[in-house]
Amino acid sequence: MPPRPRFDRRAPVRELPNINERINYPQLRVVDADGTQLGVIDREKALEVAQERELDLVLVSEKADPPVCRIMDYGKYKFEQEKKAKEAKKKSHQTEVKEVKMRYKIDQHDYDVRIGQAQRFLKAGDKVKCTVIFRGREIQHTALAETLLRRMAKDLEEPAEIQQPPKREGRNMIMFLTPRKTPLVKKDDKEEPATRAVRTITAPPRPTSARLASKPAGNG
């Protein structure tokens, strides 16, 4: 009986970057940290220049002849590259339409569950289709379904805004919510400080010495 194949459970070996002593090419075209072309120089000389500047020698184009290296702060460069990759991934997120279904007669617990689902979808950048399903004669209660959907929109007004208000679609009533692009400004936040100051009660002025002097003296 042939032996069973063994699976290598070890983590994959991470490819180390070609920097400093790990660069094995004898001749390099070197670009300084400020973009100045240092020309084609020996590997040892390039490493010496990088060490003098307390920076790293980084291989940026291995296929060139000779290979191109740049003198830079590799730690800072790596951080910026990872940041750019995260931003690009975030921008490439494909917006999906997630659906939250319910009946117009829904209890509080189930309603809270639907709110939580919608919040997660909106946080991920997806649109939410809120659907109230009618069965049989329930179709006559469209007004109650619309009230329920508008209540949901109100409870989700911070992370979302209405893209399409409640409307009848076959035997369902639907509403579309989309992630809010700008922060919600509440009425209290709109009030200017000067407007609030008008509401303060101003104390009456205290009598001055001039007013006291003009008061007629008593006959006593």
Swiss-Prot record:
Instruction: State the compartments where it is located.
Output: Cytoplasm
Q: Does the keyword Nucleus apply?
A: no
* Keyword line: Cytoplasm, Initiation factor, Protein biosynthesis
Instruction: Please give the Gene Ontology molecular function terms for this protein.
Output: ribosome binding; translation initiation factor activity
Gene Ontology cellular-component annotations: cytosol; membrane
Q: What is this protein called?
A: Translation initiation factor IF-3
Stored Pfam families: IF3_C (PF00707), IF3_N (PF05198)
Q: What is the lineage of its organism?
A: Bacteria, Bacillati, Cyanobacteriota, Cyanophyceae, Synechococcales
